[in-house]
Amino acid sequence: MSVSKKPMVLVILDGYGYREEQQDNAIFSAKTPVMDALWANRPHTLIDASGLEVGLPDRQMGNSEVGHVNLGAGRIVYQDLTRLDVEIKDRAFFANPVLTGAVDKAKNAGKAVHIMGLLSAGGVHSHEDHIMAMVELAAERGAEKIYLHAFLDGRDTPPRSAESSLKKFEEKFAALGKGRVASIIGRYYAMDRDNRWDRVEKAYDLLTLAQGEFQADTAVAGLQAAYARDENDEFVKATVIRAEGQPDAAMEDGDALIFMNFRADRAREITRAFVNADFDGFARKKVVNVDFVMLTEYAADIKTAVAYPPASLVNTFGEWMAKNDKTQLRISETEKYAHVTFFFNGGVEESFKGEDRILINSPKVATYDLQPEMSSAELTEKLVAAIKSGKYDTIICNYPNGDMVGHTGVMEAAVKAVEALDHCVEEVAKAVESVGGQLLITADHGNAEQMRDPATGQAHTAHTNLPVPLIYVGDKNVKAVEGGKLSDIAPTMLSLMGMEIPQEMTGKPLFIVE
């Protein structure tokens, strides 16, 4: 008979943030004797679950996908926007071999460097600061012919806000003494995602042939003419920017073309028009053999260079457990099952060796305020049985209630959800202690602690950027460390289990055994 295992259990109370203010705070308003006692008597700390600490832009609220990726990875996992911001700030961007290689090859052959992308401060599909950095990279490396093809936004930015951005780039080119804005067109044409190829064709012709419906001497003049035609940024018609005596910027074989959008969905169609030999969306008037670089991978089947391929996460918590022949269980309701499996495993769909999974069906109700306890009783029953089974070295569980009921904006329901969770935590903590295991209780982001927006007085249904609790229950004498974040959880668990922490995990243990 094998020895019974004493599991390391991680319970993630989804959407269970920490907020001092009591007003409109479902967690404070709920009767939670169990969590109150644990917070009062057990080692605990507060950890960051939003913004830069989880790889999101500064002060941006956390979310479940990002939260679980960070929890399982044991390192900050940067989202594309933040990853690029960081790369540009520390100048790694300017040494990116794919970008520098494309620019150098074009420059050495006397060819042009074309840069295209959504000129926007919206940060949803792209960011104009990244495009500016690309212009600087091309100029620094000695490219003489630098052409910017600006797709205008007006959806993730105000409808008529492109002028200041275009001015900034025209001033930049003037200061460099080389390069120019060569075309402008609304994202409605250049960034279609619904196979409306007639739109994409207009953008393709503008770029490849330097032909459009309109022409202007400067980008700002072209934009003002569009406004006079009653076209907002998003719908600006294909406009060639070319002053008297300037050469045209039509693309030629051997030119470099760098696409500076980082979000894939609206970048794919125009990319395929340039890259796919068998492209049939429309009859291309000019097929041009450019050195095409995607900033990120827009689709696995688009075969061209990628400056920032998807980061594959090596030695996540789940993978490290498997490599060390440990058994693990992932358990949640339908609503958060993908989070404790796929996202916690760093985007890996298949389970690791020794990894079991239990899915509890979430209740079939229109909205969860109608059943705020959700399926927590059944989930707890299965979790307690797994803890007592002696089968698992570690168990990861997510209770969705705080988040799913928090999203409804119904305060009374959120209070009931939190009270249901308190009973569950009591059962789980008792089970863990009865087998000599260890338990960490935390959250992936906040939600239920802020049920009304103080600015508008309306229901607050979104996540928050507040910290989340972390509590230790177990027989080890530990001291909490301040200033933690979600990516410290995996190293904390490994440390409490007496295991080595892989070097890829840059997070730090938050409970030190004394």
Swiss-Prot record:
Described function: Catalyzes the interconversion of 2-phosphoglycerate and 3-phosphoglycerate.
PANTHER family: 2,3-BISPHOSPHOGLYCERATE-INDEPENDENT PHOSPHOGLYCERATE MUTASE
Keywords of the record: Glycolysis, Isomerase, Manganese, Metal-binding
Quaternary structure note: Monomer.
Cofactor binding, per record: Binds 2 manganese ions per subunit.
Cofactor(s) it depends on: Mn(2+)
EC number: 5.4.2.12
Cellular-component GO terms for this entry: cytosol
Binding site for substrate: 125, 155-156, 187, 193, 263-266, 336
This protein's name: 2,3-bisphosphoglycerate-independent phosphoglycerate mutase
InterPro entries hit by this protein: Alkaline_phosphatase_core_sf, BPG-indep_PGM_N, Metalloenzyme, PGAM_B_sf, Pgm_bpd_ind
Protein's organism: Escherichia coli O1:K1 / APEC
Encoding gene per record: gpmI
Family annotation (Pfam families): iPGM_N, Metalloenzyme
